Amino acid sequence: MDIGYFLKLMTEKNASDMFLTTGAPVYIKIEGKLYPLGNTGLPPGMVKKIAYSLMDEGQVPQFERELELNMAIAVPDAGRFRVNVFKQRGEVGMVIRAIRSRIPSIEELNLPQVLKDVIMTPRGLVLVVGSTGSGKSTSLASMIDHRNSTTTGHILTIEDPIEYLHKHKMSIVNQREVGLDTHAFHNALKNAMREAPDVILIGEILDAETMEAAIAFAETGHLCLATLHSNNADQTIERILNFFPESAHRNVLMNLSLNLRGVISQRLVKGHDGRRLPATEVLINTPMIRDLLRRGQVHEIKAAMEASLEEGMESFDQCLFRMAKAGVIEQEEALRAADSRDGLALKFRLSEGGSGEHDPYADFSNGAPSITHGF
């Protein structure tokens, strides 16, 4: 089996991932959906043979010792790929992810223009949140590329794994991958300050130690970007608090009120053409939000966001309403993805009743721009 052929096909089809497992055909993932490449399952031993052909002399014994391995490969006319090799049911399995060098712009992704202001802020903490596969990495890469193309500085990323390769433009971009460029995530964080960064990207916050490091970077005059697994802005604050004991919550909220710059929440919805589009919720740390954080009134953040459209904030349901009214997505798709299905349904009914009020969400008058690079 010529793995190079399949990797080139993966690139041609703009697939994000490829799956190789014994007993099943090769699958590729495009726009979040799996497609088989043929009908014949891979025979026993085939995936192991392919995996070992991609490893160097040191990686083979490492895999046999640890039973899992991460590595990066480059294939002419196909590009760069991240390969995860593992054991399953006594056989070897592989997942190959494309590492893209072409980074879509904020405009191409139809992201809120306020993100350009957010990424250009000199200091503070910016969180991009959403579920796995919601396009967080793509949006972050787009934001970083905007800053890289606009101003000078040193951008340092700590990722597991690297998903987009950034070129040096106006800024210097150093990308460190856990397992390849550093042995451990926390080791890289501890040494980050010695590398004189202006912007630090933390691939994902999973514990209190990483959260404390992110806040510390922001406190010391850096712009810190990070991702979290949460569904919306107020849930993000609750998730952060849950990293810490209750006795520390007041101090954490004070630190967030002083250092948080914004929370961008994202989920993907299906457009009329079947492509996945980002629906975004934007929280900006305005004086009103800062005061709510200080007082611990997290439950009031959603209402404050919905009342602050002119400051660049927007809730998920407002974004979904706007996209549906512009014909970008179906109403049922908007309702499916809504935080409050009943609340959004009521908003649709009121808008269809012809109240005569100006619709503050209808700024998709010409529909969403064509997205060449999907999530």
Residue ranges and their predicted role:
Residues 1-375:
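Short, flexible helix-loop junctions that flank or precede catalytic/ligand sites
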